[in-house]
Design a protein with these regions (language model features):
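Surface-exposed loop and membrane-interface regions of Gram-negative outer-membrane beta-barrel proteins
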Residues: 40, 76-92, 102-148, 161-169, ...
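N-terminal periplasmic/intermembrane-space "pro-region" immediately following the signal or transit peptide
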Residues: 2, 9, 15, 22-87, ...
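Transmembrane beta-barrel strands of outer-membrane/channel proteins
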Residues: 68-76, 110-114, 152-156, 195-199, ...
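Outer-envelope beta-barrel architecture signal
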Residues: 60-66, 104-108, 148-150, 189-191, ...
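C-terminal structural cap/anchor segments
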Residues: 313, 318-412
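Residue-level signature of outer-membrane beta-barrel architecture
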Residues: 58, 72, 98-104, 141-144, ...
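Signature for the C-terminal beta-barrel architecture of outer-membrane proteins
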Residues: 30, 146-152, 169-328, 387, ...
């Protein structure tokens, strides 16, 4: 296994080599050549020498672009598995992007990823913590996602829709999630409709990470900005099929999965600084001999106070995902969370999954300055039914069911801070603590789970990565927790 020192020297050598290429390209640039495509506005107080890749990219031919990202995160979980086990480690992730656009209507996009963990003692050197030098994205796109009315894509790509409660790349994880996909997007001003057929790419020991045969995911996802005033209306239909497979823990021992999810996501703003966000899903189909009948719902609302010095936003959230009340019967009511970006959706500690769950949260977000943002939140978790399991963020069983036991999983406190120099460079740190409730005290050793962390994220351009298919733009001022 490559050592931390060797890995750091390799990345440093790559960074310095790119810097030298950028300077050499600058010295040899023909003053009469065509200017590079304009980049999004970036903070003027950010020194350009911090972004040598951006300088090199500006001097490459118009049809060729390079970019990428480097991220470090220290984590020190305490109470792993609700026991006295602790760990402290460094997560390291490097992504390199190459985009080729010979025509406005034709794009080839490639991205490799190297994710590693160092200094760990109890956390495994495996997905989702480590997956070295893998093909993360690789696709060809015909048509433009920002002009015209249709484009088509085939290859390996990250999928991201709505609030990522159902489909997302799970970017907080060191490895994350990507798909082998074929998709067609129809778009005009005010709407986009995506039709796709895909298969999630699992972690494995191979560089290409071939998908599991028969584990397929199909969908039609619409996004309309002209139906709800000052809001977005997103209906969707998803179809998932999967074989019995030990790599799919939610299906182990139950049989073949054939499941349809019908959902609706609506979010927007209201007068007087109020905002709202809702999403509801219903599921039907079969899982082996079981008939599926499950549902989930999320409702959130907030109120901003822009006239206050820190411009706080106070918010409330409620979240429900059904569970199976009678495991001996033929009805399967456990909600399938599909492929979400779960981080912070069910707590920042990422110990709770959206299956057999009741959650309530209250919090406040504040801007200490233009670059500093903080957030504090408190939430409670309960099992929807004590006859079903307690599920982890991954969807796997965290603690088996104990019928008749208390449904109270615990309460969580989250304290989060982020300093964003610009879209290219930002830092963050925080602390989350899940206080064990009666259920965890009864079914485990009952230790609280604590999650302190600190991270640095560096994009190769101070304007952020702008290449590849635009799936959804980040709203102005959006939190990146």
């Amino acid at each position: 296994m490559i050592s931390m020192r060797t890995h750091s020297w390799l990345l440093l050598a790559l960074f310095l080599g790119i810097s030298m290429l950028a300077e050499r390209a600058h010295a040899q640039t023909n003053p009469n050549s065509n200017p590079a495509p304009s980049q999004p506005a970036a903070d003027s107080d950010s020194p350009s020498w911090l972004f040598p890749v951006a300088k090199l990219d500006e001097r490459l031919p118009r049809w060729l672009h390079i970019g990428g990202q480097y991220r470090n995160r220290l984590e020190g979980p305490i109470g792993i598995g609700y026991t006295g086990t602790n760990d402290f480690y460094l997560l390291d992730r490097f992504r390199l992007i190459i985009g080729i656009r010979p025509k406005e209507w034709l794009t080839f996009f490639g991205e490799v990823q190297d994710s590693r963990i160092f200094f760990n003692h109890h956390i495994a050197n495996a997905n989702p913590f480590e997956d070295s030098w893998t093909l993360w994205q690789s696709y060809a796109q015909v048509g433009s996602s920002t002009s015209g009315w249709v484009d088509a894509l085939a290859g390996r790509q990250v999928l991201l829709f709505g609030d990522e409660r159902v489909i997302g790349p799970s970017n907080w994880l060191n490895v994350g999630r990507t798909f082998d996909v074929a998709r067609i997007d129809l778009h005009q001003s005010g709407y986009q409709v995506s039709v796709f057929a895909s298969s999630v790419v699992p972690g494995s020991s191979t560089y290409l990470h071939r998908a599991i045969p028969g584990n397929n995911f199909y969908g039609v996802y619409g996004s309309f900005n002209n139906i709800v005033p000052n809001g977005t209306f997103e209906p969707y239909v998803l179809w998932r099929v999967a074989p019995p497979n030990p790599q799919l823990p939610e299906e182990v021992g139950h049989g073949h999965l054939n499941e349809v999810t019908i959902g609706l996501h609506v979010e927007g703003t209201l007068p007087a600084g109020f905002d709202y966000d809702t999403e509801f899903d219903g599921q039907t189909g079969s899982l082996g001999v079981y008939s599926i009948g499950a549902w989930a719902g999320y409702v959130g609302g907030g109120k901003a106070f822009p006239s206050v010095a820190t411009a706080p936003r106070v918010y409330l959230e409620g979240n429900y995902a059904s569970g199976t009340k009678n495991p001996a019967g033929r009805d399967w009511n456990t909600f399938d969370s599909l492929y979400p970006s779960n981080h912070d959706k069910e707590g920042f500690a990422d110990q709770v999954g959206r299956r057999n769950l009741v959650q309530f949260r209250v919090g406040v977000e504040e801007n200490l300055s233009k670059k500093w943002r903080i957030r504090q939140s408190f939430e409670g978790f309960w099992l929807a039914t004590s006859h079903d399991n307690f599920y982890a963020s991954s969807g796997a069983i965290a603690v088996p069911a104990r019928p008749g036991a208390s449904r109270h999983i615990g309460n969580e406190l989250d304290l989060i801070a982020e300093y964003k120099m610009n879209k290219g460079l930002n830092f963050g740190f925080g602390y989350a603590r899940l206080f064990a409730g009666q259920f965890l005290q009864t079914t485990t050793r009952g230790h609280d789970y604590q999650y302190p962390y600190a991270y640095m994220e560096y994009n190769f351009s101070k304007s952020g990565s702008v290449y590849g298919k635009v799936v959804r733009s980040e709203p102005a001022g959006a939190y990146r927790w």
